[in-house]
């Protein structure tokens, strides 16, 4: 589950009209959310608040084995008035990353005004308001010692360019040693057709570059053709993207290189019926280390997703296989509250099987139960699906397993006014030399079961309350 300030930061990206999907860093976002999720390892409590549309705070306390905490503050120049901040109102799908349905490439819109409205709507406003650049400031102080301070500065320089400054400073472990600090500077450029990212880190003077290219129509040229642009986006059913990244450090002589491909369906970008389930395929290569990884993610239904990954190294002949899934569920109480909306949907011929009819090529609507409503226009399927599903889920279950039988299970949901995340990790654990020697003396190596045993690795619970 995302932290509260991470959720606010995503809301800032949406309010400032920045497309975070059009980046090489987000190439495998869906597979990572379904396969590489983390589980809590101890008890953790988070208290957060969006006190004003511009200011948010978070206080964190962790216990069981090690007591630590953090204090975080966030400020943004873009008002987040329409962003739910209470833990009872935040859509759970906004906090739990899952199958990421990206949108078709488009030209970045104008910057929002100081009151949060789109720039193209404020025609009669002054130029000073139109040129207001969205800015975000975020700082976190981690306690107890060694104290660490982290910060983030985001600023939109133009509709297509964003500047990011991130720093980390740790207190020295000994009085005579110098404190450790690092600054990472990123300049991101997004035109819709392609995106680029330039990076510099003061840690070993690391330079980096990332780029992503989308095959297909160019949104910059289509934007000048009016209706032709909308017709082209409506007919775009899938998207193929290719990208690469490179790093170099003259201080430590470190070189890094990787490249990747992504193919994904775009059901949200078209009004034409789809005859396949939404899915995403990725292929990433790291030539210097000889690593190759492929992922396949599938949205089997609005509430069920599957993902798998296969990795292989041509130098060591080592392989990796991981599979995972997520299942969204609803409580019986919310089903009773939604009876009225379901009856209204039935009058229009829209029910929970609409998505399945589209896959089979059948009409989107079921037979109407009220002939008086036959002449009314049915609601659009995409609006019905996207507006209903984010608020209709109360909990989610995630499970992943690899070839070594390392299993992670995670449950995240809403309990009263709290957002709770509970997880467990199982897998082979190394035996101590003493227990292995005693087992070998009694029954030999076979009786001991080898150098490892299967058992619990971690169990934890995280609780979030926000206002």
Swiss-Prot record:
Its main location: mitochondrion. It comes from the Eukaryota. Pfam families: MDM10. InterPro entries: Mdm10. It is a multi-pass membrane protein. GO terms for biological process: establishment of mitochondrion localization; mitochondrial genome maintenance; mitochondrial outer membrane translocase complex assembly; mitochondrion-endoplasmic reticulum membrane tethering; phospholipid transport; protein insertion into mitochondrial outer membrane. One of its GO terms (cellular component) is SAM complex. Lacks alpha-helical transmembrane segments, suggesting that it resides in the membrane via beta-sheet conformations similar to those predicted for other outer membrane proteins and porin. Component of the ER-mitochondria encounter structure (ERMES) or MDM complex, composed of MMM1, MDM10, MDM12 and MDM34. Associates with the mitochondrial outer membrane sorting assembly machinery SAM(core) complex. Belongs to the MDM10 family. PANTHER family: MITOCHONDRIAL DISTRIBUTION AND MORPHOLOGY PROTEIN 10. This is Mitochondrial distribution and morphology protein 10. It comes from Ajellomyces capsulatus (strain G186AR / H82 / ATCC MYA-2454 / RMSCC 2432). The gene is MDM10.
